[in-house]
């Protein structure tokens, strides 16, 4: 797994590895304004339905994910993004393994 430093170029896909049968998260930035977090999901993993207090920008960086927002399923592939509105019910399913970066800005 690669590392990263502020002020230096890094490959976000190389910063986080997959864990067999699991979900891995790595927070890149966290401050009073918001957070940027990388996640990797192995096949068959997911997150049950929940709400976020702020808009969330999801960027898939490897594989493809299934995101259900307010009962509508979306398939998002590497290189694609989706903004989840604040307060929207959503869940995540990994039909195949994938990595994503989520950016949440408080406001």
Go through each PLM region and give its residues.
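Conserved short histidine dyad/triad with adjacent acidic residue
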Residues: 22, 37-52
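A short, N-terminal "cap"/entry segment at the start of jelly-roll beta-barrel domains
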Residues: 1-33, 68
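Ligand-binding loop in jelly-roll beta-barrel domains
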Residues: 86-107
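Structural motif
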Residues: 35, 64-66, 73, 89, ...
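Short acidic-glycine-tyrosine-enriched beta hairpin
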Residues: 71-86
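A cytosolic small-molecule/anion-sensing beta-strand core signal
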Residues: 61-62, 77-78, 96
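Short, conserved beta-strand element in jelly-roll/cupin
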Residues: 40-42, 52-67
